[in-house]
Amino acid sequence: MRPVLAFFMLLGVAAARTSAPTAAEIMQKVAENQDRGQKERLAYVYEEHIDVITRHTNGKLAREEITDYLVTPTAKGVNKKQLAVKGRYLKKGQYQSFAGDPVPGGGEGLDGSIVESFRHDLTEDDSKDGLGKDLFPLSTEEQKDLKFELAGEQVVSGRKAYRIRFTPADRNELTWAGEALIDEEEFQPVSVYTRLSRRMPFAVRALLGTDVPGLGFNTQYKRLDKDVWFPVSFGTEFRLHAVFFINRIITVSMENRNFKRASVDSRIEYGEAAPPSQ
């Protein structure tokens, strides 16, 4: 009898050892990989394509700017060199098209300011992968005020992934909540979806006339090499109400593409390099 009991006890220990990690353990490994992976992501040159659109609430386009950048590694991070900019905007009932700098009305007026602000946020030079680090809870710093839940597993492009839900530890805090798919083998993000954890406070909506219904972000990642994953697409569309009279629908999309691994020597020269080959 004792050998039988011992056998089942060993089975229980083995099962415990092979059971899925907790959501907190999974995200801790993700954070460690993100913190450690900064150097690996600096080994790549790539192009960044950004499209920002503002529309009136009736759906009529107010302004659109499409910008392409070449992203290259530097000693302190990355350098983003603008390759092209084009777009159109509504002026006196007619659409005016433009290409190249200076951008007409860039940073001026309501729509020019909105477009420039979003474009600047997406092209911050401190980001190693083209996205502001405060948008997603992937690094150690961004995870400290969140709680996580393992919601299941699924297969994405032939690879198993954990489905992790996240919410603020303080339910009264206005910050990000959402869901992430995490690769089970390398503990890297496959996709991340975020939304505001709750509505704007009533006082802000009532007294300041400000709200952002539908605000959230959706990002897809791609595996370039072992333990090296990059965001390859980013998108959001939401409505902006601000100080009673500002009312716009804002659409933002970003695509990272044409990745090319840089050699040690090319890192020094890539500041003035030509775009990667198609």
Predicted features, each with a name:
Residues 6-8, 22:
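Residues at the start of alpha-helices and the adjacent loop-to-helix junctions
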Residues 1-4:
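Positively charged n-region of N-terminal signal peptides that target proteins for export
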Residues 17-177, 184-190, 195-215, 223-232, ...:
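Structured extracytoplasmic
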Residues 8-17:
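Hydrophobic h-region of N-terminal signal peptides that target proteins for export
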